[in-house]
């Protein structure tokens, strides 16, 4: 486990919030401003994400977002696991 990252600071500096849950899960609630690309489509749609900004991935509990971070880092993105979307939303928006 690396050093604790301040996700709020990263997001305030313009990071992209990537929600890798299914479109149905995303429709039921998500972090304001998040982009939804389900994990099983990330490889095909990764170019939709800007490479010049950090990406904070989230999902329901942190498992899928962890996989997404591995994919993103392998493609040269600066990526962070934001964990579950509801706790990330609380961290960012109070």
List the predicted regions and their residue ranges.
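Rhodanese-like catalytic fold shared by cysteine-dependent sulfurtransferases
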Residues: 2-16, 23-54, 63-94
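Short, surface-exposed ligand- or partner-binding patches at beta-edge/loop junctions that are enriched
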Residues: 58
């Amino acid at each position: 486990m690396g050093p604790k990252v301040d996700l709020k600071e990263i997001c305030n500096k313009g990071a992209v919030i990537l929600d890798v849950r299914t479109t149905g899960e995303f429709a039921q609630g998500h972090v304001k401003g998040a982009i939804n690309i389900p994990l099983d489509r990330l490889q095909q749609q990764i170019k939709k994400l800007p490479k010049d900004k950090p990406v904070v991935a989230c999902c329901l509990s942190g498992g899928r977002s962890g996989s997404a971070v591995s994919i993103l880092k392998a493609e040269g993105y600066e990526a962070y696991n934001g964990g579950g979307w509801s706790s990330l939303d609380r961290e960012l928006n109070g």
